């Protein structure tokens, strides 16, 4: 099929696919700013940094989101936020002592920047949702006009409810076959890293449904919520799987909505993309995200600049046949979330909490939205180690919670099965979950994991009845080895009897 007539939008200017493929001169307009990239064939040297102001605007937006959630979602101090959350940024603005930023403790908002070269960026906390980033032309006064989502918490008090539905944990000895010293050594392995760029906030180990190890860094406790980053994708997949199980969505039917811009002749091959394609990160659509999401393109516009997450996700060119190429892209997840919204209608806003979070006791979890009320389930979920432990336990229990089946065995098989387009690349990715890499012989092959930026991992090891949760605030390029942590924890189970 010829995909050349499909077009892509970044910002508001339409870019023809032929220009993308031939690497010709492309002009992108995003949030009113311009990039002029010279033709590759011309080999001209640019002397002006066209990205400078976009980068600065988006970085200010990042800092606004990090500070707002750090202060009001995680309930951390300004000193902690600058020392850890903002270590992710190349050049944070100001210090804990002050700078070109304002914190409005009464309205729970943050304003970043001086407004001289680029607009000030603002983020505001909303109860039950977390912080929302506003576009440059909105202020904290506009927050009241945003779509209202009423997400009440359940009546049960977690502190008085026994684990795993609540946080009341009874002291119990380790099983006789578990080596406590080896478990402590694994914990030290997680917390005492050689690289200062690897910062472990919490470690939780569940065995046969019980908490057998729990440890937190100074200034963090079991109630501390931090961003899951792409571990949110696994939560999104779970919610979507529930709808597939109910027959409200289908893995192999077209997504069922229009892409942007709409095809003039009505013949748009993008409408052939299925839910399986996007959950397998194999949509065939143009990849626009970039490392760090620091530019004013792709999902970075939604995360840090106030753009619509659904408009951006639907505004990409089809450059490959769907299902034939794997390319990690936040927008693919957001297309799946948009399909979920279309299937749910008026039930959309309540669905994550009603169908999953409240069911399994994830009461400390917030699912954030963009300013239009669309869940950004590719990254913006805030939670703690215990709630992610519950999430992993749901999968360890084959989708059953309190004798109620929430997700089918078929869906669990899907998320653990290699995406077809990854088979020649090691088969590490499934349906928004990650698999053990080929050639890695130090961990069981049945293990699988969520994975989020800055070291957010929930590892499920069915053969050992284990869930391992590691939360981090890593920065830099030295990624934390979740499979190495799994190996170290398993050293404590060498005497575990075979089932």
Model-predicted regions and their roles:
Residues 181-183, 187-189, 210-215, 249, ...:
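Short, charged, amphipathic alpha-helices and their helix-cap/turn boundaries
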Residues 237, 332-339, 379-401, 456-472:
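Active-site-proximal alpha-helical segments within enzyme catalytic domains
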Residues 166-204, 208:
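Beta-lactamase-like hydrolase cores
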Residues 29-37:
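Bacterial N-terminal signal peptides
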Residues 209, 227-252, 278, 336-340, ...:
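Active-site SXXK
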Residues 147, 450-499:
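Structured C-terminal helix/loop/strand segments within mature extracytoplasmic catalytic/sensor domains
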Residues 246-285, 315-318, 344-383:
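Active-site helix/loop module of the DD-peptidase/beta-lactamase fold
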Residues 364-365, 412-467:
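Active-site Gly/Thr loop motif
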């Amino acid at each position: 099929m010829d995909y050349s007539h499909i077009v892509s939008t970044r910002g508001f200017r339409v870019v023809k696919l032929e220009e993308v493929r031939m690497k010709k001169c492309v002009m992108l307009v995003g949030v009113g700013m311009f990039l002029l990239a010279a033709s590759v064939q011309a080999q001209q040297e640019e002397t002006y940094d066209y990205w400078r102001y976009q980068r600065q605007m988006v970085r200010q937006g990042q800092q606004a989101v990090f500070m707002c959630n750090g202060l009001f979602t995680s309930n951390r101090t300004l000193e902690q936020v600058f020392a850890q959350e903002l270590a992710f940024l190349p050049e944070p603005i100001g210090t804990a002592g002050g700078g070109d930023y304002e914190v409005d403790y009464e309205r729970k908002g943050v304003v970043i920047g001086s407004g001289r070269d680029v607009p000030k960026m603002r983020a505001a906390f909303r109860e039950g949702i977390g912080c929302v980033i506003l576009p440059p032309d909105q202020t904290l006064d506009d927050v009241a006009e945003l779509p209202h989502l009423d997400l009440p918490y359940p009546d049960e008090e977690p502190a008085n409810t026994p684990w795993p539905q609540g946080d009341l944990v009874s002291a119990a000895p380790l099983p006789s076959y578990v080596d406590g010293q080896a478990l402590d050594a694994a914990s030290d392995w997680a917390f005492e890293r050689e690289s200062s760029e690897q910062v472990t906030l919490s470690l939780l180990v569940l065995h046969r449904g019980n908490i057998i190890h729990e440890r937190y860094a100074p200034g963090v406790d079991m109630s501390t919520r931090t961003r899951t980053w792409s571990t949110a994708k696994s939560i999104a997949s779970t919610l979507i799987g529930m709808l597939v199980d109910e027959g409200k969505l289908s893995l192999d039917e077209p997504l069922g909505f229009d892409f942007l811009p709409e095809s003039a002749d009505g013949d748009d091959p993008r409408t052939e993309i299925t839910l399986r394609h996007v959950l397998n990160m194999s949509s065939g659509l143009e990849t626009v995200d970039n490392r760090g999401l620091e530019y004013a393109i792709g999902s970075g516009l939604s995360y840090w600049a106030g753009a619509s997450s659904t408009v951006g996700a639907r505004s990409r060119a089809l450059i490959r046949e769907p299902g034939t190429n794997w390319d990690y892209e936040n927008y693919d997840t957001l297309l799946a979330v948009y399909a979920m919204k279309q299937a749910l209608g008026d039930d959309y806003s309540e669905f994550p909490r009603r169908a999953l979070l409240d069911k399994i006791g994830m009461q400390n979890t917030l699912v954030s939205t963009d300013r239009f009320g669309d869940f950004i389930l590719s990254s913006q979920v805030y939670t703690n180690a215990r709630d992610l432990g519950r999430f992993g336990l749901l999968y360890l229990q084959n989708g059953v919670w309190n004798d109620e089946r929430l997700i089918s065995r078929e869906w669990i098989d899907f998320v653990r099965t290699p995406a077809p387009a990854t088979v020649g690349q090691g088969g590490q990715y499934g349906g928004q979950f990650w698999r053990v890499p080929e050639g890695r012989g130090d961990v069981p092959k049945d293990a699988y994991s969520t994975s989020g930026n800055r070291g957010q991992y929930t590892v499920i090891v069915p053969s050992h009845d284990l869930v391992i949760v590691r939360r981090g605030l890593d920065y830099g390029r030295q990624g934390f080895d979740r499979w190495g942590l799994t190996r170290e924890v398993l050293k404590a189970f060498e005497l575990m009897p075979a089932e």
